[in-house]
Amino acid sequence: MAFPPSAGFTWISKTHNDTYPTITAAKCKQHGRAVFVTGASKGIGRVTAVAFAQAGAPSLALGARSSLDAAETAVLDAAKSAGHPPPQVLKLTLDVADEQSVADAAARVERAFGRLDILVNNAGRVEKWVPLAETDPKSWWATWEVNLKGTYLMTRAMLPLLLKGGEKTIVNMNSIGAHLTRPGASAYQTGKLAMLRLTQFTCVEYAAQGVLAFAIHPGAVDTELASNLPEDTKAKLVDSPELCADTIVWLTQEKQSWLAGRYLSANWDVAELMARKEEILQGDKLKVKLVL
């Protein structure tokens, strides 16, 4: 898939389309962690929850608007196959764009786990891609409601629980689209760009209390959300959901405070990313800002 250099796809020279030995979730350690994954009923969200179970996370909250029964079964099976005790699974009917729904979820997580270590804001929406004058205002804004407002509401409600936890880590599901201006994608791509700034604000305001937030492009994954994408784009969705899921589990098994507020891509080889840590820190790279 060809992207302009400014999109950063090949900024790390070695890229992946599927999971690889370095990041395999079953080799990672998430013992003792309480994890919340939104949009967990299917797609990347469900696979991410499964990956945390494979890594031994004992407490998993799964949030979605649709049934989570299949996701719960997959999580329990994954933990068993990896040789871990069955995790405590909290299934939450959740609309991330609804303040009361999010507040209710936070209350249930607190009752069940007492705190939260890792929040994965995965729930998302993609509108039908058409030029601005042809957009439906309700559909256009609904994308922002889920992708940005949903991330804001979840972060806002879960921060008190994260501050009680050990890892205090937030992973926001982003997109390479934040760095693109594809005709027709005005709601999705502007919302993802705004999410990057929200990720930075989270760190600016809470890093002193130990909170870490970063955003990640999951790769080009063929999920249910992709149904509204143009056909030429759908044909390029060749990455596995396991690539992103395992990358997230690997990146959060040890606290990577230097990633605070930054944009990452699941396609990037993590060994090369880590090798460029000093370059990233010295240049304050992988953040949204005006370069003059």
Swiss-Prot record:
Keywords: NADP, Oxidoreductase
MF terms in GO: oxidoreductase activity, acting on the CH-OH group of donors, NAD or NADP as acceptor
UniProt entry tagged with the keyword NADP: yes
EC number of the protein: 1.1.1.-
Presence of keyword RNA-binding: no
UniProt pathway: Mycotoxin biosynthesis
Family: Belongs to the short-chain dehydrogenases/reductases (SDR) family.
Protein name: Short chain dehydrogenase citE
The organism of origin for this protein: Monascus ruber
